[in-house]
């Protein structure tokens, strides 16, 4: 990988990339390490599609697309989708799965900052799901997403709140007790408080439209969207 050749792609954590490269071959295993992403994807997709007024015919960018779970599902909704990621192996998995599924997605290995330098104002919808907590400078990602979306377009972020409850739920619970995700997936110090994310949004052309929590019930083994942003949350913003 050549992730340090230009100033635009400095915003890369190679240790984070290595975590996902190591398990990339199992990205589409519904019972594997990415089972939670498969489980929550219908909720994410539904929220994005509803808040954006549908995806059919729209040009969509998925930032930090990984193996393509969300990107493929948005393409199935009729969107023209580009997926960005700095992980070579996850992108190879995404490309192969799209080919096998007969789904057209344009997968590109570059940072969102690099992409923004070439494609500013070209997307109707930009999604950045579970990615901000894996880069050194998440505010830079927020700025780039704002640059990439058209006037009036929608940008969606999802990440984890930083507090004791999120540490218990997302790290201790999900990684060590329930073993829903591999140990070491999350670093609570990199979690982002909603006020911090909204502060970064306020410094761009984006405006907050809606925020919701994503909740897991271990008793029913189910996920749902609803009030409360103590752990996982999703933010809908719109370009002014």
From Swiss-Prot:
The protein's name: Ubiquinone biosynthesis O-methyltransferase
Organism field: Shigella sonnei (strain Ss046)
Similarity comment: family membership: Belongs to the methyltransferase superfamily. UbiG/COQ3 family.
Keywords, comma-separated and alphabetical: Methyltransferase, S-adenosyl-L-methionine, Transferase, Ubiquinone biosynthesis
SUPFAM superfamilies reported in the protein's UniProt record: S-adenosyl-L-methionine-dependent methyltransferases
Reactions catalysed according to its record: a 3-demethylubiquinol + S-adenosyl-L-methionine = a ubiquinol + S-adenosyl-L-homocysteine + H(+); a 3-(all-trans-polyprenyl)benzene-1,2-diol + S-adenosyl-L-methionine = a 2-methoxy-6-(all-trans-polyprenyl)phenol + S-adenosyl-L-homocysteine + H(+)
Alphabetized InterPro entries for the sequence: SAM-dependent_MTases_sf, UbiG_MeTrfase
EC id: 2.1.1.222, 2.1.1.64
UniProt-recorded Gene Ontology molecular function terms: 2-polyprenyl-6-hydroxyphenol methylase activity; 3-demethylubiquinol 3-O-methyltransferase activity; polyprenyldihydroxybenzoate methyltransferase activity
Gene name of the encoded protein: ubiG
GO biological process: methylation
Lineage: Bacteria, Pseudomonadati, Pseudomonadota, Gammaproteobacteria, Enterobacterales
């Amino acid at each position: 990988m050549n992730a340090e050749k230009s100033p635009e792609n400095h915003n890369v954590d190679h240790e984070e990339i290595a975590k996902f490269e190591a398990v990339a071959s199992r990205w589409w295993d519904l019972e594997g390490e990415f089972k939670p992403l498969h489980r929550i994807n219908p909720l994410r997709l539904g929220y994005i599609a509803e808040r954006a007024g549908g995806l059919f015919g729209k040009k969509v960018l998925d930032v930090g697309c990984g193996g393509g779970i969300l990107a493929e599902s948005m393409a199935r909704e009729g969107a023209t989708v580009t997926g960005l990621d700095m992980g070579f192996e996850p992108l190879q998995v995404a490309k192969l799965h799209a080919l096998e599924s007969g789904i057209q997605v344009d997968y590109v290995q570059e940072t969102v900052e690099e992409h923004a330098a070439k494609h500013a104002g070209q997307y109707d919808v930009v999604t950045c799901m579970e990615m901000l907590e894996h880069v050194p400078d998440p505010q830079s990602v927020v700025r780039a997403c704002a640059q990439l979306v058209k006037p009036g377009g929608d940008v969606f972020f999802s990440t984890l709140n930083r507090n004791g409850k999120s540490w218990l739920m997302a790290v201790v619970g999900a990684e060590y007790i329930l073993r829903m995700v591999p140990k070491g997936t999350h670093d609570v110090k990199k979690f982002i408080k909603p006020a911090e994310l909204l502060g970064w949004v306020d410094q761009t052309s984006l405006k907050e439209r809606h925020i919701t929590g994503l909740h897991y019930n271990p008793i029913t083994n189910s996920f749902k969207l609803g009030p409360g942003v103590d752990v996982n949350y999703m933010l809908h913003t719109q370009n002014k």
